């Protein structure tokens, strides 16, 4: 890599000496990725061991919970919004898409490596787990008794978990029933719902305002 100049040289100067760096033609990078879209840089790494929910949520005040969100593009967009709008952590059910899937990581603009995240344990009630950690849970769902996102009752809560559901079906009815609050986003022109990634950005922004 001694012949590398320009911006690439600046990037390489930040790499620790024990990280091997290789250069290749664009055709080679395309073959490695399996598709033509590449930003000119690839990285291979070992997956870190995931922390427990309790470890991830230490000192957290506003977190997101993703129940069976399946689309990697949505996962990436949600992580990007979570980072930009001040969410402290993201928790996922095991049935959802992997945040480290390459499309999810790319759409997140790398924020899957910035926002703390982990999977919720299977076989136990994760709403109860979050309650034990001091969180009040907020289901984003369309119901007649849903609160507005700026409801003062939410403002009074020191620790909130915003719960978002899978594409299409949304949250399971049992999940909604187990949450402390149900909230909805007011919409116009007869539109009854938003894509989960778009809805997450609206909800995270409001929680950031509540968080001060």
Model-derived regions: residue spans:
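N-terminal positively charged helical leader segments and presequences
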Residues: 1-36, 136
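Short beta->alpha connector loops at strand-helix junctions that form conserved
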Residues: 24-25, 67, 93-94, 116, ...
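Internal active-site segments that recognize and position negatively charged phosphoryl groups
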Residues: 60-99
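Active-site/ligand-binding-proximal alpha/beta "capping" segment
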Residues: 138-191
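Structured adenosyl-cofactor binding patch, chiefly the S-adenosyl-L-methionine
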Residues: 41-43, 81-85, 96-112, 173-212
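Acidic/glycine-rich phosphate/pyrophosphate-binding loops and surrounding catalytic core
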Residues: 34-60, 96
């Amino acid at each position: 890599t001694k012949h590398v100049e320009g911006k690439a040289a600046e990037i390489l100067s930040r790499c620790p000496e024990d990280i091997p760096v290789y250069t290749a033609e664009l055709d080679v990078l395309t073959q490695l990725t399996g598709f033509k879209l590449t930003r000119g840089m690839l990285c291979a790494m070992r997956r870190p061991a995931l922390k427990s929910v309790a470890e991830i949520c230490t000192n957290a005040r506003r977190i997101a919970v993703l129940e069976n969100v399946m689309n990697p593009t949505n996962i990436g967009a949600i992580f990007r919004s979570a980072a930009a709008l001040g969410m402290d952590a993201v928790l996922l059910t095991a049935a959802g898409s992997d945040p480290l899937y390459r499309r999810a990581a790319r759409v997140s603009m790398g924020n899957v490596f910035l926002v703390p995240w982990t999977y919720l344990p299977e076989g136990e009630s994760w709403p109860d787990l979050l309650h034990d950690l001091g969180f009040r849970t907020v289901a984003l769902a369309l119901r007649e008794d849903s609160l507005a996102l700026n409801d003062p009752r939410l403002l009074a809560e020191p620790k909130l978990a915003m719960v978002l559901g899978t594409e299409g079906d949304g949250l399971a009815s049992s999940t909604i029933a187990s949450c402390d609050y149900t909230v909805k986003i007011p919409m116009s022109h007869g539109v009854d719902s938003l894509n989960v990634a778009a809805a997450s950005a609206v909800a995270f922004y409001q929680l950031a305002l509540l968080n001060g």
